[in-house]
């Protein structure tokens, strides 16, 4: 069997959820959209089911997958519904849709619902991606209430730069949210992962921890005690001696400056490892630090074994996880941990805890 695996530590997932809930102080939705950021939504939700206050997904199909797997807690649909036909299933399965534009209000007004919906009303406080702005927030709230088809209305917003504590954008968004929602009753939900960790003023009734659940710290410094949930590993499948001056891989990006011993690893960009990872990107081979050399191929990559004489065919190679911080790999590749995690595929997933 090909040795590429993603080891998912469910104890670490639970640790991170508890940390988020403790730091925030209120209830916390575990965000498991995008297949739990590549970790497996059903397995992650089941692991958190005994203690999570609820879950958040992007759209209806993701929620239905959780319901079919026995998840009974609150599930929020962060994109809301896409057409009126979805409202029947939303009601039937007890889901809470986000309402972020007027067409969704019209769907609710015109629908024949078996019972009132609890909804989350999204405020655009400065990210300018989705939601109602300024006075339109109050108007939307009044329309929803006047429809007679909604129960509790939770007011929410989303921060664009909460992971940049030195800039004032988040403080400005908080002020804009407070102005737009002044006088409107109901719970509030403001804090994403970065705000849970770095913006106490954003702590309200509901937090929405996402990336932090999976152990990738969104804040500079990474001193928040998160534990990595995914360890991406594979094995050395061949070893080659490379002479000084010899090129390696596509484009001859790497040229050996001295004789090198190279390990070929069964992992490539088709598995989700970034093709843009540069020479020198850290890896760990049999518990010892090493590095990527040469361009990542579709199914394979190459690592330096020169100073690891005991390493050879069958040696385990950690690409990120417990020993190799995913944020370090992402930064070198010019991307973010979110993208790397969501892109993992073609590997065997193994769960523990």
From Swiss-Prot:
Pathway: Amino-acid biosynthesis; D-alanine biosynthesis; D-alanine from L-alanine: step 1/1
PTM sites of type N6-(pyridoxal phosphate)lysine: 33
Matching InterPro entries: Ala_racemase, Ala_racemase/Decarboxylase_C, Ala_racemase_C, Ala_racemase_N, Ala_racemase_pyridoxalP-BS, PLP-binding_barrel
One GO CC term, this protein: cytosol
Cofactor(s) annotated in UniProt: pyridoxal 5'-phosphate
PANTHER family linked to this entry: ALANINE RACEMASE, ALANINE RACEMASE, CATABOLIC-RELATED
Protein name, UniProt field: Alanine racemase
Organism: Azoarcus sp. (strain BH72)
Higher taxonomy: Bacteria, Pseudomonadati, Pseudomonadota, Betaproteobacteria, Rhodocyclales
């Amino acid at each position: 069997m090909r040795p590429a695996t993603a080891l998912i530590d469910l104890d670490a997932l639970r640790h991170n959820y508890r940390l988020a809930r403790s730091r925030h102080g209120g209830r916390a939705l575990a965000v498991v959209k995008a297949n739990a950021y590549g970790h497996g939504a059903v397995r992650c939700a089941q692991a958190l089911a005994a203690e999570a206050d609820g879950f958040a997904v992007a759209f209806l199909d993701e929620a239905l997958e959780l319901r079919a797997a026995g998840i009974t807690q609150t599930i929020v649909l962060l994109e809301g519904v896409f057409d009126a036909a979805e409202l029947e299933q939303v009601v039937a399965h007890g889901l809470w849709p986000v309402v972020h534009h007027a067409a969704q209000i019209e769907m609710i007004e015109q629908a024949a619902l078996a019972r009132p919906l609890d909804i989350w009303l999204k405020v655009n406080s400065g990210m300018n991606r989705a939601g109602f702005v300024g006075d339109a927030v109050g108007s939307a709230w009044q329309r929803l209430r006047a429809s007679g088809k909604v129960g509790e209305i939770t007011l929410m917003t989303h921060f664009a730069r909460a992971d940049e504590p030195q800039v004032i954008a988040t403080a400005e968004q908080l002020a804009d949210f407070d102005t737009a929602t002044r006088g409107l009753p109901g719970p509030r939900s403001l804090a994403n992962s970065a705000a849970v960790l770095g913006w106490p003023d954003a702590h309200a009734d509901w937090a929405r921890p996402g990336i932090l659940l999976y152990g990738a710290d969104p804040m500079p410094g990474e001193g928040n005690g998160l534990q990595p949930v995914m360890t991406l590993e594979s094995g050395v499948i061949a070893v080659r001696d490379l002479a000084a001056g010899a090129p390696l891989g596509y484009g001859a990006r790497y040229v050996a400056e001295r004789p090198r011993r190279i390990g070929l690893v069964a992992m490539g960009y088709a598995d989700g490892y970034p093709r843009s990872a540069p020479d020198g990107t850290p890896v760990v081979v049999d518990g010892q630090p090493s590095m990527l050399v040469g361009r990542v191929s579709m199914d394979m990559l190459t690592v330096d074994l020169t100073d690891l004489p005991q390493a050879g065919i069958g040696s385990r190679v950690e690409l990120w996880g417990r020993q190799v911080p995913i944020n370090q790999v992402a930064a070198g590749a010019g991307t973010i941990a979110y993208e790397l995690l969501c892109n993992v595929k073609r590997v065997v997933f193994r769960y523990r805890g």
